[in-house]
Amino acid sequence: GGTPECAVQTLEPVTVSLTSSYPATIKGKQDVEIRPQVSGFITKVCVDEGSMVRKGQVLFVIDPTQYEAAARSAKAAVATAEAAVSTQQITVNNKRELNKKNIISDYDLAMAENSLASAKAQLASAKAQLISAEQNLGFTNVKSPSDGIVNNIPYRLGSLVSPSIQTPLTVVSDITEMFVYASLTEK
């Protein structure tokens, strides 16, 4: 007996691709929820889902009517307060001259000076209200805080929105960098 014979085959190298599928989520570097800072009806949707936007670009317009009226009213209040300060300043100047000549008492002069201080305080308050009114008017143009892609837009023309809404107007995803999140099993 000798060595038993066996079949011999020469192997050739071949390229084999092994593929596996895994669920994954692709996200941008940062997702920013877009929420209104004032209440009102959406009068214009300026972008489409999936569109690229730039920082500062208007995404939505909220009806500005009431905010324009509030800004006009605040401007009028500032003008009224400025006039009151001017009038009170003239009164104080006149009373100072009369007081120097002993025509009116120190008390009368002090009352006029207090009225001037009060008018100046009302002017400062009116100016603060004007700044707030103009800021709210500006918030009727809902702008993108960054460059990115607009995600789903659940609100449409005519929707009533407010700062307390549960769902954001949309999400802008900064895609300057992309990240893939996958779940890999240990098998």
Model feature map: region roles:
Residues 26-28:
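Structural recognition of beta-strand segments within beta-rich domains
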Residues 4-7, 147, 167, 175-178, ...:
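Beta-strand/loop subdomains of soluble extracytoplasmic proteins
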Residues 1-23, 186-187:
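Acidic, gly/proline-rich low-complexity N-terminal segments at the extreme N terminus
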Residues 11, 18-21, 33-164, 177-181:
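Amphipathic alpha-helical coiled-coil/rod segments that serve as protein-protein coupling scaffolds
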